[in-house]
Amino acid sequence: VVAEQDRPQSTVINWREHPNVVSDEEIIEMVHFAQSLGLKVILKPMVNVSDGTWRAHINFFDTDVPCEPKWSEWFASYNEFILHYAKLAEETECSIFVVGCEMVNADRREKEWRDLINEVRKLYSGLVTYNCDKYQEDILKWWDAVDVISSSGYYPIDKWEQELDRIESVVNEHNKPFFFCEAGCPSWEGGDLLPNDWTLRGKADVNVQKEWYEKMFSTTVKRDWVKGFALWDWKAHLY
């Protein structure tokens, strides 16, 4: 479920009656359909910025300044958004609920995230995770607050082993399950070296994508602590 805020420093998240946000009825229908097929469902509310800025750049001063937007204002709106979908996740018996995705600058607001997770647990009885961005697994300070560690697995094809070594140390430290809540590679030349950069364009090459996925799966299958993947949807209209 993707909501939007107007700019990186906006403090209001537009999710009620927004034309780009799917309705609760649509979510319920799709969750029940997936479950009827025997699938387990992860509900993942996300925030995008309407002007195209990546959500990792949502940021405010650490110390409140008069007449400037504040973290407290942003989290008030974000919490309302997340708690609505936590309740929906409980009602539809989703297996995992994701409290946030790739909010790199917001990650440092440890107290706000811990408080939010505590409120989520009052509404939702399933597994709770946070989807940190690539390279942030060993930087996030509040993994103890969630049930499952998850991250975005957009690593260069020749770096998988060393990145898995780094992530493994985090998993061992916290003794929690781990999965890639996002992972993928676009099917264009050069995509295997910068799979996270959706702004790049190159000649279409499905073998680039195929070899990247083969590398990801062949390296992670040897790591029994990697419990699974949620694969990103690369849309054909990009070409």
Located regions from the model:
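Substrate-binding cleft and catalytic face of glycoside hydrolase catalytic domains
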Residues: 1-12, 25-106, 190, 234-237
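A short acidic, glycine-rich active-site loop
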Residues: 16-25, 65-78, 199-211
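Acidic-and-aromatic substrate-binding clefts and catalytic sites of carbohydrate-active enzymes
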Residues: 6, 18-22, 75-79, 104-110, ...
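Aromatic- and acid-rich polysaccharide-binding/catalytic face
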Residues: 82-101, 132-161, 176-177, 181-196
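Surface-exposed amphipathic alpha-helices with a cationic face
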Residues: 28-40, 90, 113-125, 168-175
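Aromatic-lined carbohydrate-recognition surfaces of secreted/lumenal glycan-active proteins
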Residues: 42-47, 96-108, 114-138, 175-183, ...
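Aromatic-rich peripheral "rim/lid" segments of glycoside hydrolase catalytic domains that contact
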Residues: 11-17, 190-239
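Aromatic/hydrophobic pocket-lining residues that form the small-molecule binding cavity
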Residues: 23-27, 78, 82, 113, ...
